[in-house]
């Protein structure tokens, strides 16, 4: 009596067992990176680091579905130069080596930022000292990875919500010139890397911060500051995706050779919001690509909002499938 039960169970399960590899092949064939490249863009990327690449299905999904990686934390100042002149490249080296071995583009993130900044930097009060420290940090990182990194977020989150420049140790001690100095230093260190100014809440064309960064980038570029791109982080609340359709063309109007969506996640991961952001990039000729800020929801910096394209079991969510369908049109 047992044998027929086993046979029946086997027959019932057989279609599902057979479907698994087919499903995996289908997902691999529907790489959002391959699809967006077919639409004329350079990459569809993701933020990651060694701790992610060595756990779960992160590495396999990135290999199959994404074409660019941004280090989530390993290239930030607190990780790379925790004390003055003492550099630690272990995490950054791992990411760069993995990306090169797997044929992925790399976005360097980030060189000058007020957050995750060691206290030895934030406590500097002398202008010349801080200028030299900043220049040395930029030059050291960019020289180490010269020719390996497609683009760098040179200056990150320099603006307040009202469009004024954020009060940071760099602004307060060096003055507004810290931004031109940072970009000029970066250009000298790796002339072929694309140099970005990167910020969040650039998701509405009518928002003061969005308008301010456009105006200031125009001014800086007119003065010869080598800014190649504006990065819009695009950390969205539910329903904000539609605003990017108007905001991204405004950012592109600053005249930089490139713009990019650099840290995308959406609270609730609405397919509509994600598709709106993808279409915004498709509609703007200078938009080179999109980077989502992590693979799976539990690893997100805002995990409780389930904002990413894969769930906790590394299964693609409706937003991922919606992007695939959108890019296939």
From Swiss-Prot:
Listed GO biological process terms: xylan catabolic process
Active site feature: 157, 263
Residues with Pyrrolidone carboxylic acid modification: 27
GO MF annotations in UniProt: endo-1,4-beta-xylanase activity
InterPro entries: GH10 (IPR044846), GH10_AS (IPR031158), GH10_dom (IPR001000), Glycoside_hydrolase_SF (IPR017853)
Annotated SMART domains: Glyco_10
Reaction catalysed by this enzyme: Endohydrolysis of (1->4)-beta-D-xylosidic linkages in xylans
Signal peptide location: 1-26
Keywords linked to the UniProt accession: Carbohydrate metabolism, Disulfide bond, Glycosidase, Hydrolase, Polysaccharide degradation, Pyrrolidone carboxylic acid, Signal, Xylan degradation
Gene3D superfamilies: Glycosidases
Domain GH10: 29-326
EC number: 3.2.1.8
SS bond list: 281-287
UniProt family annotation: Belongs to the glycosyl hydrolase 10 (cellulase F) family.
Protein name: Endo-1,4-beta-xylanase
Organism in which the protein naturally occurs: Thermoascus aurantiacus
């Amino acid at each position: 009596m047992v044998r027929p039960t086993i046979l029946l169970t086997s027959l019932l399960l057989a279609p599902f067992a057979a479907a698994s590899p087919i499903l995996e092949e289908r997902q691999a064939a529907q790489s959002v990176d391959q699809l967006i490249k077919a639409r004329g863009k350079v990459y569809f990327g993701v933020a990651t680091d060694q701790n992610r690449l060595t756990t779960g299905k992160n590495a396999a999904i990135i290999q199959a579905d994404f074409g660019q990686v941004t280090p989530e934390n390993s290239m930030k100042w607190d990780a790379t130069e925790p004390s003055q002149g003492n550099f630690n490249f272990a995490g950054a080296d791992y990411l760069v080596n993995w990306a090169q071995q797997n044929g992925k583009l790399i976005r360097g993130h980030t060189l000058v930022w007020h957050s995750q900044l060691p206290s030895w930097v934030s406590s500097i009060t002398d202008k010349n000292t801080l200028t030299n420290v900043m220049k040395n940090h930029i030059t050291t990182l960019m020289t180490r990875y010269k020719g390996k990194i497609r683009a760098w977020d040179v200056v990150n989150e320099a603006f307040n919500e009202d469009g004024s420049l954020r009060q940071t140790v760099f602004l307060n001690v060096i003055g507004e010139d810290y931004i031109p100095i940072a970009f000029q230093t970066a250009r000298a260190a790796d002339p072929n890397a694309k140099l970005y100014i990167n910020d969040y809440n650039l998701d509405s064309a009518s928002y003061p911060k969005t308008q301010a960064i456009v105006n200031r980038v125009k001014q800086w570029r007119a003065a010869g500051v080598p800014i190649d791109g504006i990065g819009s982080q695009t950390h969205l609340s539910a329903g904000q995706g539609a605003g990017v359709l108007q905001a991204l063309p405004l950012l592109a109007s600053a005249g930089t050779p490139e713009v990019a969506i650099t840290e995308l996640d959406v609270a609730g991961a609405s397919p509509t919001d994600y598709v709106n952001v993808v279409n915004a990039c498709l509609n703007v000729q200078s938009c080179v690509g999109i980077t989502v800020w992590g693979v799976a929801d539990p690893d997100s910096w805002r995990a409780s909002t389930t904002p990413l394209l894969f769930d906790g079991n590394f299964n693609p969510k409706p937003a991922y499938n919606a992007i695939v369908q959108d890019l296939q049109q």
